């Protein structure tokens, strides 16, 4: 059963500006493991990566119904990729499956998250 759906879209140029003006922005958004992956990317891909992770984490928090803040922070959410490159979020609840999709265009990054309860 679906228990939450979230979506978020961000403008790449705004993320690029934040990354340039506020170096701590990246540290605030990415977990340590995500930051390791980030360091391996080209400049253009770094912007897309941060924007995509930001959008996915916001979408996840929206699907939870809480938003980013008191109950969940950016560092509570880690997005990994499977062997085929498909992104996934590990839910702290063993009772849930989290589906995530991240996409980029020339100007935007967008993410959608669906949280599914496994037990009834």
Curated annotation (Swiss-Prot):
Biological process according to GO: fatty acid biosynthetic process; lysine biosynthetic process via aminoadipic acid
Binding-site positions, Mg(2+): 8, 58
Matches recorded under NCBIfam families: acpS, pantethn_trn
Keywords: Cytoplasm, Fatty acid biosynthesis, Fatty acid metabolism, Lipid biosynthesis, Lipid metabolism, Magnesium, Metal-binding, Transferase
EC number: 2.7.8.7
Record GO cellular component, one term: cytosol
Protein name: Holo-[acyl-carrier-protein] synthase
Localization (cell): Cytoplasm
Pfam families: ACPS
Superkingdom: Bacteria
Keyword rRNA-binding: no
Main location: cytoplasm
UniProt enzyme class: transferase
Similarity comment: family membership: Belongs to the P-Pant transferase superfamily. AcpS family.
Keyword Metal-binding: yes
Cofactor: Mg(2+)
Role description: Transfers the 4'-phosphopantetheine moiety from coenzyme A to a Ser of acyl-carrier-protein.
GO molecular function, a single term: holo-[acyl-carrier-protein] synthase activity
Catalytic reaction(s) noted: apo-[ACP] + CoA = holo-[ACP] + adenosine 3',5'-bisphosphate + H(+)
């Amino acid at each position: 059963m679906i228990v939450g759906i979230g979506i978020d879209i961000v403008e790449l140029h705004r993320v690029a500006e934040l990354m340039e003006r506020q170096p701590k922005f990246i540290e605030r958004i990415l977990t340590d493991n995500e930051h390791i992956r980030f360091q391996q990317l080209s400049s253009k891909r770094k912007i897309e990566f941060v924007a995509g992770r930001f959008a996915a984490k916001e979408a996840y928090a929206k699907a939870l119904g809480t938003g980013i803040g008191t109950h969940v922070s950016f560092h509570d959410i880690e997005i990994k990729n499977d062997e085929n490159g498909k992104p996934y979020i590990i839910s702290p609840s063993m009772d849930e499956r989290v589906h995530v999709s991240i996409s980029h265009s020339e100007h935007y990054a967008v993410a959608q998250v669906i949280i599914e309860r496994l037990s009834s």
